[in-house]
């Protein structure tokens, strides 16, 4: 936390890296070229598949990339970065994106160096008005398409029955989606395939009801869906969840500040000097040290509409 700050800007990272470590600019160029290739491969063949069909992984592009992709799946991000850069600050810049994946650089596969393509090559985008503006824009688009959005309503149950999916286009869509019955239940045995018939709900004013549905897309926390919303005979046991590693949670602080903070950029990453101890405490579930890595977003540096004139809006992770 006591090193002089470095200013990382999209399109200028090679110059920065070279100034901190001779030869690092050239190595960063190769690093980002690899990150861009892996990102393109992931977006084209991995991001939009549910991996239910092996053929998705047998595409010629994927097979050609296996010699490079294999070691990146087996090796860790930390060692991948350390083999190319010596300066601790450069290692932290390239390793920290693992945090946004809910893990640490030594546990994340090296394949995730593709995150640096987004940070340092593509660049970070910010919607004026914050992400609330993005939500509003999406709501407008789906309403124009005939979608009804209900707020102040809690989904209390997903109803599932043991019978075949409907015929036709909706049935084919439902067959492609992961089924609640495909996971192991409380009894530890596989359940019969089923299909959803609806969703039960309860509103803030105490009213309750249900909606018929052929397909349910649940964007809630997966643990909540699998242990609370599904019918008892189709839930995933808590003992199963106890064996899973969901990744660390985060402490988020939203702060409105009177006065200006020009010393903060829109994005500021403050790294602790004892990088390994910081991640180790998180992984072991221990209390954090007094000096710990934090991320500060000063959105008012870019967007004048998020705070009164002369004041600041901060998001601290």
Identify what each model region corresponds to.
Residues 2-107:
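Rossmann-like flavin
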Residues 23, 30, 76, 130-137, ...:
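Generic recognition of stable, solvent-exposed alpha-helical segments in well-folded globular domains
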Residues 55-68, 105-139, 144:
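Helix-loop-beta segment of a Rossmann-like dinucleotide-binding subdomain
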Residues 80-84, 96, 137, 141-145, ...:
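Generic, well-ordered alpha-helical scaffold segments in large soluble proteins
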Residues 105-107, 304-311:
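Short glycine/proline-enriched loop/turn "hinge" motifs that connect secondary-structure elements
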Residues 141-156:
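A conserved beta-strand/loop element that lines the FAD pocket in flavoprotein oxidoreductases
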Residues 156-178, 188-308:
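Mid-domain catalytic core of redox enzymes
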């Amino acid at each position: 936390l006591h090193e002089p700050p470095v200013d990382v800007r999209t399109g200028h990272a090679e110059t920065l890296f070279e100034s901190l470590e001779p030869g690092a600019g050239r190595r960063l160029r190769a690093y980002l070229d690899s990150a861009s290739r892996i990102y393109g491969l992931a977006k084209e063949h991995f991001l939009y598949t549910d991996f239910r069909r092996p053929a998705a992984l047998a595409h010629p592009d994927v097979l050609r990339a296996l010699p490079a992709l294999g070691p990146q799946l087996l090796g860790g991000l930390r060692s991948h970065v350390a083999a190319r850069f010596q300066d601790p600050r450069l290692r932290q810049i390239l390793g920290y994106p693992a945090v946004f994946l809910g893990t640490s650089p030594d546990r994340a596969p090296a394949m995730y160096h593709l995150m640096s393509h987004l940070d340092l090559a593509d660049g970070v985008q910010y919607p004026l008005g914050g992400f609330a503006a993005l939500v509003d824009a999406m709501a407008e688009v789906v309403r124009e398409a005939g979608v009804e959005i209900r707020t102040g309503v809690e989904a209390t149950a997903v109803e599932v029955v043991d019978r075949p999916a409907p015929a036709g286009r909706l049935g084919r869509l439902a067959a492609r989606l992961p089924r609640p019955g495909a996971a192991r239940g409380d009894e530890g045995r596989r359940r019969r395939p089923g299909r959803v018939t609806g969703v039960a709900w309860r509103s803030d004013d105490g009213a309750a009801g249900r909606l018929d549905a052929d397909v349910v897309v649940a964007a809630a926390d997966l643990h909540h869906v699998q242990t609370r919303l599904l019918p008892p005979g189709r839930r995933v046991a808590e003992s199963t969840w106890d064996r899973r590693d969901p990744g660390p949670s985060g402490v988020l602080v939203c702060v409105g500040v009177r006065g200006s903070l020009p010393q903060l950029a829109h994005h500021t990453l403050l790294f602790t000097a004892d990088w390994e101890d910081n991640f180790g405490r998180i992984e072991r579930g221990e209390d954090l040290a007094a000096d710990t890595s934090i991320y500060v977003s000063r959105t008012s540096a870019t967007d004048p509409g998020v705070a009164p004139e002369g004041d600041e809006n901060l998001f601290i992770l």
